[in-house]
C-alpha cells in the first residue's frame, strides 16, 4: 500500500501560511495590497495589541460580489490573472491567490463588503472554514477584520517578537505602502493612537513629511531621469540627515515596494564620499518600467524580484543620485534653535504648523544646508561617467542625453573666501559676503588629493620615474603567496613588484605623482589592501587606494600654515568636483551666516 497521500485543504493552507503569514505585518501587507488592487483611494487600518488581537482594514474600493467572497478564500483563487501569459505582465500587487486562504487558515476573519450596484453582506470564517454569510448594511468597499491571529498554531504565536517590535514592523510596512501610493489616503491607528495619516493628494513629499517629519522633508531634493526602458523619479534627502541602517532607502518598482541589494547599493554609491562611515541616506526612488522586464513571482511575499536589465537600472540610479547631489551646495550652516517655551492650552489652538520658515532665537545648534543659487558649470568627474538625462524641479522638461554632455546645470560652488587666519593650527577661518566660514584643513586637502590620485590611477598609461636606489620590501611567506595572486591589481596602481629571492621583492620605478614622503609605507599599505581585497576588482581598488593615499598624505591637524598656503588650499579645493565633504563623508566647511552672528551679539532680536 502506498504511503504518499494528498494533504487536506485546511492543512495545506496552514503550511502555506508559514511562508505567506510570517507575522502580523504580513497580514497587514496582504490586506492593504488587496485594497489597493481593488481601486481604493482611501485605506483605514486599525490595530490592537500590535495586530495580534485585531487587524482591521477598511477601503472604498469596488468591493466583492457575494458569490466571489467564499471563492476568494480558496487557495490559488484570484481575479488578477487568467493564464500563464499573464505572469509575465503583472500589473497588480497581488496575483498568487494564496494570501486570503493562508490568513484565514490561522485566524478568525470577518469580511464585510458591498459593490455600488449590489447589497452588502458579511461573512465569518474560523480557521479557514466559512461559518455563516448574512446580508448587512455597509458602505461601498470592503472591510476585513482579522482577529486571534495564530490561534491554532501556538508555536508560531510563541515565537513572535515583543509587541513593540511587531508594531514597528507593521509601521515600516505601511510606510512603504504609503510611499508607493501617495495618491491614496492612509490612516493608521493602534489602540486609538494615530500612527500615520496621509492626505492622498499624490504628492510624495507630503507623504515623506508625514512619515519622516519636517526636518527631513525640508532637505528633500528631487530629480528624474529616463532611458528607453526605465523612467526614474528620485526623492533624495541631503547628506546632512542620515540614519544608522539602510532600511530608509525605499525602492518602488511599478508601484511595488521591493528589496534589491544591487539597486540599494547603487543608491549608496551615489552618496559615496558624502556620508560618514556607518551612516546611510534617506531616499525614495520610483521606477516605471515594462512589466516584461521584472519577475515578481520569486517569493510568496513578492518583496524580492528579478530584473532582466538590472545593470542598466543600477547605472541609471547611481548616476542620477551622483549628479543630483553634486549640484547641491552642501555647506552646513550653524543656526540657533528657539528656546523652549511652555504653551498653555489656550495657545495650542493658535499654533502654526505650516512649513514657512520662522525667525529663530536660541542656544543650541542645528546643521542645515542653504538653498543653492544655481548657475551653469562644466562638470568634471574623476570617475568619468556619462550622466543620465536629468530634470530637476521646478523645470518639467526632459533633457536628452546629448544635451547633458554639452552643458550640465550646477549650483554655485565655493563662495569667494578671504582668509582671516588659522585656529589651533587645524582650522582655517575665512570671511565672505554672507558670513564666516571655518574650514577643516585636513579634510580639505584630503578631498584635493583623493581626486588627484583617483584621476592618476585611472589613466591607462602612467609616467614612471626610476628610483636611484631600488626599494627592497620583505614579506612573510603567507603574504608572498597572496601577492602573486594580486600582481595585476598592484600593476593598476602603478606598483611593479620584482621577485628578488625568497620573500623579498624589488620596486625599481614608481609613478611620477606618487607621494615621496614615506614611499615604503605607501606601497606596503597598497599591497596590504590588495591582499585583503583578494578579488581583482579594479574599480573598487582604485577607489580605496585613492582614499588611503589621500588620508595618509594630507596635512594633519596641529599643522601651522602661512597665509599663502591657506589661500592655495582654498584655490585647489575650489577646483574639485565635490568641495563640501572629504572622501569619508565629513564636512569640509561650516558656515555662520551674518544674520546668525548678529543674533549671537544681540544686534538683532
From Swiss-Prot:
Pfam families, per the entry: DNA_mis_repair (PF01119), HATPase_c_3 (PF13589), MutL_C (PF08676)
Top-level taxonomic group: Bacteria
One GO term of the biological process aspect: mismatch repair
CDD domains reported for this sequence: HATPase_MutL-MLH-PMS-like (cd16926), MutL_Trans (cd00782)
Assigned keywords, A-Z: DNA damage, DNA repair
HAMAP family per the UniProt record, alphabetical: DNA_mis_repair (MF_00149)
Role, per record: This protein is involved in the repair of mismatches in DNA. It is required for dam-dependent methyl-directed DNA mismatch repair. May act as a 'molecular matchmaker', a protein that promotes the formation of a stable complex between two or more DNA-binding proteins in an ATP-dependent manner without itself being part of a final effector complex.
Full protein name: DNA mismatch repair protein MutL
Gene of this entry: mutL
